[in-house]
Amino acid sequence: MSSEPDAGEFHEMREPTVEKVVVHMGVGRGGEPLAQAEEILEEIVEQQPVRTTAQKTIQDFEVREGDPIGTKATLRGEDAEEFLETALPLADIDRKQFDETGNFSFGVEEHTEFPSQEYDPQIGIYGLDVTVNLVRPGYRVHKRDKVSRSIPSNHRLTAEDAVTFLESNFDVEVSE
């Protein structure tokens, strides 16, 4: 059952919303490139990013567990929706990018595609990954500590619901 009105069966508790948007830039190493990536990400999302660290050692990439290798920022509420209005036109969204619970991810190959950014030969070009988490009202029941319950299957978001939400609210066409 989708969130669209079906013969008068539409209910506001079935309307999907954007819970959060996570914007991530993986640099692969610390130092100056990571500092530049943090600065770029802060300009794009207008929020202070946090560093991400390597979860395990990979000798071939010369990365040790605990080394800072990337940066990310989590956007919620109006900030998340404003960012999506800017970022979604820069990406081609395909149905394969949606999971079975309605979440989706996409990449932006060059940070210079954002209106606030210009190419600087001293910095170079960085790409970024965007992950969008969609929920319906009532999903907190699953996450709360006391008396948590599972979400009924007829209330869970599907990929079809997420595509419909994206196309109607953000004016984006999702390709097959």
From Swiss-Prot:
The keyword Cell cycle belongs to this UniProt entry's keyword annotation: no
GO terms (BP aspect): translation
Keyword terms of this UniProt record: Ribonucleoprotein, Ribosomal protein, RNA-binding, rRNA-binding, tRNA-binding
MF term (GO), any: tRNA binding
InterPro entries tied to this protein: Ribosomal_uL5, Ribosomal_uL5_arc, Ribosomal_uL5_C, Ribosomal_uL5_dom_sf, Ribosomal_uL5_N
A Pfam family: Ribosomal_L5_C
Any one GO cellular component localisation term in the record: ribosome
Complex and partners: Part of the 50S ribosomal subunit; contacts the 5S rRNA and probably tRNA. Forms a bridge to the 30S subunit in the 70S ribosome.
Function according to Swiss-Prot or TrEMBL: This is one of the proteins that bind and probably mediate the attachment of the 5S RNA into the large ribosomal subunit, where it forms part of the central protuberance. In the 70S ribosome it contacts protein S13 of the 30S subunit (bridge B1b), connecting the 2 subunits; this bridge is implicated in subunit movement. May contact the P site tRNA; the 5S rRNA and some of its associated proteins might help stabilize positioning of ribosome-bound tRNAs.
Similarity remark: Belongs to the universal ribosomal protein uL5 family.
Protein name (record): Large ribosomal subunit protein uL5
Protein source organism: Natronomonas pharaonis (strain ATCC 35678 / DSM 2160 / CIP 103997 / JCM 8858 / NBRC 14720 / NCIMB 2260 / Gabara) (Halobacterium pharaonis)
Gene: rpl5
